[in-house]
Each structure stands twice: as structure tokens, then as C-alpha cells.
Amino acid sequence: MISHRFKHILPGIAFFAYLNVLPVAIHAESGDSQVLIPGGEYNLGSYYCEEEQSNADWCNDEALRKVKIGPFWIDKYEVSNADYRECFIAGVCEPAVLHEDRPKDFNKPRQPVVFVSWEDARTYCAWRGGELPTEAQWEAAAQGKKLGGAYFAQPYGTGAPEDTGKFTANSNGLYDMMGNVYEWT
């Protein structure tokens, strides 16, 4: 989730291999659960797709371009099953397909929630006092403080959702920005 100190935004709601997933909510009040991303100019798009592998199956980005954004706060972690369950128990969020046929590998409390639609992700963010980040905000947060080039130094994942925070944080102090699951914006 991301925020402008007054307004929170969730860093994304995700899907993993055609499954929808949701990241963790942020609260500006609890300083250690969020990171401030400074405003400024950021590159939006992928250097890798633009310069090296424009024919790669996953390269669906628009042309690389500069965007200007203001400062915002974003959660350090993706929304876990346990986080999303609180919203469901409060009667605000729809169930995240909590059926017996859901693979047990997707049910662990600390794993990112899956089977959540974009609308459900927005509802969750609003319940937490925030909103989803824009694509530009998410990319600025994911890029970290590294300038230029691709960001493949981060571990990409293991082929199945892992507990939130399992992989090393990027230079902004955000976890699981590459790999694990994709994010809604």
C-alpha cells in the first residue's frame, strides 16, 4: 500500500500464474511498516524489454519514458493471507476463495493472499485507509535507489508463493518487489 503521508496506497494486489494475489497494507502511523519513496522523475517501463529482449513473452511494457511523481509511503510487505482475513472477518472484504480445493501451498498465513480481484484489492486498501499505487508509483518503489539498467539482482522467486518478507529487501527497504507474486496497481 502507498501513501502521501495523508493518503495511503497499497503497493499492489497481485496474481501468481493466473491467480490473483494481494500485498500487505500500510499505515503511516506505524512508521516501520511503510517506507517513504521520494518524489521526482522515474523511468517507467523496462530497460530490458526496450534494449535487449523486446521479443520476450513477458515484455508488454510501453516504451520506456520518464514520469514525475510526488513523494508517497508504501508498505514494506505484500498483503498476507492473515492480513486479508482480518478484512474478511470485519465483514468488509469478500473471501479470497477460501475453499478446500484451493491448493494448500497458497493457504499459509504469512503467504501473500491469492484469488483476490482488483476490486477486492481496492476494497481492502480502502478498509486499511489507503489505495492501490499507480503503475508509476509501484515502479518507482520497485526500482529502488539503483539508477539505470535492469533490476535482476533481486532474487526472483522459487516457483510458488513464499512467505512475505522471505527475500532480501531492495535498496528502498521493500520486500518481494521482484518474484513471489505480481502486483495489482
Q: Across the structure, where does each feature detected by a protein language model lie?
A:
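Short, compositionally biased
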Residues: M1-E94, W118-E119
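Functional-site microenvironments in short loops/helix caps that host divalent-cation chemistry
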Residues: L36-I37, N43-D57, E94, E100-T185
